[in-house]
Amino acid sequence: MSEEERNRGAEPEERAEALADTGDLPESEVAGDLGEAAQRGPAFDRDAGKVQKDTRRGRRKERVGLVVSDAADKTVTVSVETLKEHPMYKKRIRRSKKFLVHDERNEARVGDTVRIIETRPLSRRKRWRLASIISRAE
């Protein structure tokens, strides 16, 4: 019977300890206290024995586009153009995509150039919010 077969039915703490002994898990990922069941990451404070809440947030995507519709309440449709290079012919091709964007104060109008930022899902298709209006339509 191999060591892996013996560890298959073991408790999670024992499996983590066995994996650390075999070198499959980095030592930094295994908790020193078996009662903590292999706490991971920088959010675990070994001295206090508690898990600290990580309040940092990852970088959110930003896009710049043109408002093409403002008919809905607190929602605008923004068209974002990107240039992609064709893999074989190397010609730059214009691609556009429409995003539904949350506009809390209904301040964007058709023709405005706006900066939008990724956010939590607000509805089925709305996952962006208005960050700022770069230039107004004339």
Swiss-Prot record:
InterPro entries: NA-bd_OB-fold (IPR012340), Ribosomal_uS17 (IPR000266), Ribosomal_uS17_bact/chlr (IPR019984), Ribosomal_uS17_CS (IPR019979). This is Small ribosomal subunit protein uS17. The lineage of its organism: Bacteria, Bacillati, Actinomycetota, Rubrobacteria, Rubrobacterales. Residues 1-62 are annotated as: Disordered. Signal peptide: none annotated. One of its GO terms (biological process) is translation. One of its GO terms (molecular function) is structural constituent of ribosome. Belongs to the universal ribosomal protein uS17 family. It holds the Pfam family Ribosomal_S17.
